[in-house]
A protein has these predicted regions:
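Extended, charge-rich alpha-helical interface modules
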Residues: 1-86
Length: 86
């Protein structure tokens, strides 16, 4: 789970309009930050299997959203992948 201030920064960076909080682009960006945080946590806590399971779930959810975005709006998908460096 991201801290509120960090989540707000991610939303502000990737929103598509003024009140956007749930577009696929924003959701993918938030999940990417959560994946980065969990990956860093697991480097130091190798036996934390519940966090590992959470990481796998978040990666799967992000993959599904990326697949949806690619299918619906290829240009937005390409722009997002370039911004996130995925």
């Amino acid at each position: 789970m991201l801290a509120a201030d960090k989540k707000k920064k991610v939303i502000d960076k990737f929103k598509t309009h003024a009140t956007d909080t749930g577009s696929p682009q924003v959701q993918i960006a938030i999940l990417t930050e959560e994946v980065k945080d969990l990956t860093e946590h697991l480097r130091g806590h190798k036996k934390d299997f519940s966090s590992r399971r959470g990481l796998i779930k978040k990666v799967g959810e992000r993959r599904r959203l990326m697949k949806y975005l690619k299918r619906e709006d290829q240009k937005a998908y390409d722009d997002l992948m370039a911004k996130l460096k995925i």
